[in-house]
Amino acid sequence: MIVLALDVYDEDRALKIAEETKDYVAMIKVNWPLIIGSGLDIIRKLKDRTGLKIIADLKLADIPNTNKLIARKVYEAGADYIIVHPFVGRDSVEAVNELGEIILVVEMSHPGALEFINPLTDKFIELANDVEPFGVIAPGTRPERVKYIRERLKEGVKILTPGIGAQGGKAKEAIEAGADYVIVGRSIYNAPNPREAAREIYDEIRGE
């Protein structure tokens, strides 16, 4: 299942791409570029236009009170899930989880993640198994790590994998390794025909 990462600034462009691709997309992920460029209202507009759930990829990483202050406004704006960094500690994670559903970053897809994040993977998995978030982030660029995380993660916690497409990850490989969702951005929103690009990835996952 595909999560469309709309890492663009322009509201009109984001809404157009979302409408064009909604038949092949399970959820939409909004990150800082779109929120800064278009405001928090873009969350509700995307939901109203597509009927899809929205992930707010804020990667919250602050003290509990600040995390809670941010999260409250984002959930009120219509976000279904907020992505949170676990390295700031259980109390900061739980401050967000008390307000709504969260997704924890266990590993990231870029090379730099190997330096500081990956050494803490097992601790992040342990925290995820305790707080039972909706899901965790694992790297679609490294299917073997997706498999490692899946084998240790509590049943029912979803795995979402960024890094598909532009970063080199393959959608089908990530799903076969244990991912529930593949997060795809540039390969769809920068494509000449975003709908066709989304359909091709959808068909790849389905083996068609």
Swiss-Prot record:
| E.C. code | 4.1.1.23
List the GO cellular component terms. Answer: cytosol
Q: In which pathway does it act?
A: Pyrimidine metabolism; UMP biosynthesis via de novo pathway; UMP from orotate: step 2/2
- Identify the Pfam families for this entry: OMPdecase
Top enzyme class, one word, equals: lyase
Q: Does the keyword Lyase apply?
A: yes
Any GO molecular function: orotidine-5'-phosphate decarboxylase activity
Keywords in alphabetical order: Decarboxylase, Lyase, Pyrimidine biosynthesis
Query: Which reactions appear under catalytic activity for this entry?
Result: orotidine 5'-phosphate + H(+) = UMP + CO2
Function statement? Catalyzes the decarboxylation of orotidine 5'-monophosphate (OMP) to uridine 5'-monophosphate (UMP).
- What PANTHER family does its record include? OROTIDINE 5'-PHOSPHATE DECARBOXYLASE
Q: Which protein family is it in?
A: Belongs to the OMP decarboxylase family. Type 1 subfamily.
Query: What is this protein called in UniProt?
Result: Orotidine 5'-phosphate decarboxylase
**Which taxonomic lineage is given here?**
Archaea, Methanobacteriati, Methanobacteriota, Thermococci, Thermococcales
